[in-house]
């Protein structure tokens, strides 16, 4: 029996994940079914995440500026190089990755808990018994919201990160805002923004698809929902980091 083979549980779980994605892809054309839920998810995934993204961006940029200045405390480099390093690091890597890891906890936990609770309380079964396509109604809008909102949140994190760097540099007397921006512009390339957008789209899909899968197939009552939520968050973070490495190896 395949179920008795080593690693069979992982193979079966991947099969369920692939099946859910296939059903979601097929159901994505049923816009009238998930239209209302989609706009609600835009608000929950996007608008309600702005405060935490603001804090993450500001302090990431500020700390990175202070640490970069500490490492480059020498006359061998112009002070503008600090702005270059901070801006490049934020745009290419930190704005997308750190935001994704934070959102895996905030957004991912919410989605997996919602779907898991609906599964164990038989609300999903009730939807299907009434003729609703549960995947189209519940899963598709959440994945689409991730795909569309994560790039916007990435830009938000990048902007606030650079502003945080400028502020920290000026307040701490490291370098004036004009010199920071001069350095940032000197090594700015449009391809960096494109790379960041690609990352954010991939991360949005990875996180929302994994947490939807874990929540949708949750079982075992309240304890099972908690387990599914924990697994969803951990797996999302792991696959965000793996996909980050893969994208860097392929695109850079």
Residue ranges and their predicted role:
Residues 115-139, 222-225:
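Short cytoplasmic-facing helical segments at TM-TM junctions of multi-pass membrane proteins
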Residues 45-98, 102:
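Active-site cofactor/substrate anionic-group-binding motifs, chiefly glycine-
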Residues 46, 50, 54, 94, ...:
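Selective transmembrane-helix segments that form parts of the transport pathway or gating/packing helices
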Residues 225, 231-247:
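Final/C-terminal transmembrane alpha-helix of multipass membrane proteins
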Residues 3-36:
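Short, membrane-interfacial amphipathic segments enriched in basic
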Residues 101-119:
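A hydrophobic alpha-helix feature that marks transmembrane segments and, especially
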Residues 67-91, 158-201, 205, 209-228, ...:
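Membrane-interfacial helix-loop-helix connectors in multipass membrane proteins
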Residues 41, 129-152, 227:
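Membrane-interface alpha-helices at helix entry/exit sites of multi-pass transporters
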């Amino acid at each position: 029996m395949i179920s008795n083979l080593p690693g069979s549980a992982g193979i079966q779980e991947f099969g369920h994940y692939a099946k859910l994605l296939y059903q979601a892809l097929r159901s994505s054309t049923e816009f009238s079914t998930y239209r209302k839920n989609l706009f609600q998810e835009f608000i929950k995934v996007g608008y309600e995440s702005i405060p935490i993204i603001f804090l993450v961006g500001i302090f990431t940029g500020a700390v990175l500026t202070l640490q970069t200045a500490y490492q480059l405390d020498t006359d061998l480099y112009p002070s503008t190089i600090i702005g270059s390093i901070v801006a490049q690091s934020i745009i290419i890597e930190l704005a997308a990755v750190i935001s994704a890891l934070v959102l895996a906890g905030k957004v991912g936990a919410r989605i997996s808990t919602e779907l898991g609770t609906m599964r164990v309380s038989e609300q999903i079964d009730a939807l299907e018994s009434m003729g609703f396509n549960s995947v189209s109604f519940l899963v598709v809008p959440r994945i689409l919201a991730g795909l569309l909102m994560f790039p916007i949140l990435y830009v938000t994190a990048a902007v606030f990160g650079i502003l945080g760097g400028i502020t920290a540099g000026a307040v701490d007397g490291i370098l004036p805002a004009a010199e920071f921006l001069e350095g940032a512009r000197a090594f700015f390339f449009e391809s960096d923004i494109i790379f960041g957008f690609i990352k954010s789209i991939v991360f949005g899909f990875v996180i929302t698809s994994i947490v939807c899968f874990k929540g949708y197939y949750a079982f075992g009552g309240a304890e099972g929902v908690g387990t599914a939520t924990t697994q969803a968050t951990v797996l999302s973070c792991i696959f965000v980091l793996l996909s980050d490495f893969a994208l860097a190896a392929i695109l850079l």
